């Protein structure tokens, strides 16, 4: 259930989930900011999109975002057999996600005349 042009790989970095049907909270702004944060953190990132003719699941974030509008992004790690008794994920991806989160919490997002900039807190 993925678009072959946006295939993701285990140990390939943080995965940004996007959906044209807005099943995920990711939009152009949140995706761009996430990519900026990944670059700042020295963490690779990948983009996942559902296959165009096969609707995928959704996340709680998309449901909550319909009630309270907050800029957000759906991120995670590439996995095999999600929600099964034996999920498989890359060990490097855990470290990447931790480094991304650390950078996120140490950074202030500043809106500028020409877009956004990231500054140390």
List where the protein language model places each region.
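Active-site-adjacent substrate-binding region
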Residues: 2-84, 112
